[in-house]
Amino acid sequence: MQAAALPEEIRWLLEDAEEFLAEGLRNENLSAVARDHRDHILRGFQQIKARYYWDFQPQGGDIGQDSSDDNHSGTLGLSLTSDAPFLSDYQDEGMEDIVKGAQELDNVIKQGYLEKKSKDHSFFGSEWQKRWCVVSRGLFYYYANEKSKQPKGTFLIKGYGVRMAPHLRRDSKKESCFELTSQDRRSYEFTATSPAEARDWVDQISFLLKDLSSLTIPYEEDEEEEEKEETYDDIDGFDSPSCGSQCRPTILPGSVGIKEPTEEKEEEDIYEVLPDEEHDLEEDESGTRRKGVDYASYYQGLWDCHGDQPDELSFQRGDLIRILSKEYNMYGWWVGELNSLVGIVPKEYLTTAFEVEER
């Protein structure tokens, strides 16, 4: 979404309001209720700026930069909570709910200890600091340790490139270095515990970047070759929490009644191969002509999923979910519909329900 142009007087007013909350009330003796109200409003500023790409104070940098890593003096030091650095200099797009503890993150792609190169280290400080790093939902977090309640810094991975970088060091660890670079943002340099671990970080981030640049999850080359030789495994082959007798009969989209599960050989595909003629018009038992079903938009639940938030859709293993939108694909979520209920669903919990023949 492109931000609408704001009149200058409105931008100034918003800047003044945010600065007053951040700087003007910094040293005031506020009650707990007043502090909560202030922090709530400041969070609202950050979410609106991120959602609509508005940057009232165009200062570079990432979220909550580590004071030991990045010379931060002079920037806002207020907190969203009593001890969290205020994020007013953050300008990466589309980011919300970024102040999370290391153990609170979900959909983690890669995590572990790395040495991060500081941008401006002091004379007595080390150039490389050990950080607990996590890649989750298109974000790169780095913490003081794996139990930290808030990150030292966070940045959006989209728009970066990643590669091995042995030129960063001249000691025995040079083959364990990698970096993330961007044309219009600062670079990040890291050292892993071993060359193999560094390559794994590079591979995982590269795979994520491919996913962020498309609406489908890319496959590794060896996986593509295997798929040409094999049929899809039966869904019962997936490890999941207890299903047993709880697996329910499947209601096919566009069909009348319930299709009871049958006991057939395990090698049989779970996918229904549909002829092209069924795509345009179908005929039900009453002989009425009706519009065909878009089978490509249907996905099947791999495991039970219970939504924790009101906008999350709950479903069980085997449920057929119609995907309405993939606009939140970069965060690992799609918008789906089940039994006339609409909500977001984690794409990792879904698999294609039908294999449609191409023309």
UniProtKB/Swiss-Prot annotation:
GO molecular function, one term: protein kinase binding
Effect after changing Y232F: Abolishes interaction with PTPRC, translocation to cell membrane upon T-cell stimulation and activation of the MAP kinase pathway. No effect on interaction with FYN or GRB2
Impact after mutating Y271F: No effect on interaction with PTPRC and translocation to cell membrane upon T-cell stimulation. Abolishes interaction with FYN and GRB2 and activation of the MAP kinase pathway
Residue ranges with Acidic residues bias: 219-237
GO annotations of cellular component type: cell-cell junction; cytoplasm; cytosol; immunological synapse; nucleoplasm; plasma membrane; plasma membrane raft; T cell receptor complex
Subcellular location: Cytoplasm; Nucleus; Cell membrane
Protein name: Src kinase-associated phosphoprotein 1
Protein species of origin: Homo sapiens (Human)
Taxonomic lineage of the native organism: Eukaryota, Metazoa, Chordata, Craniata, Vertebrata
Gene: SKAP1
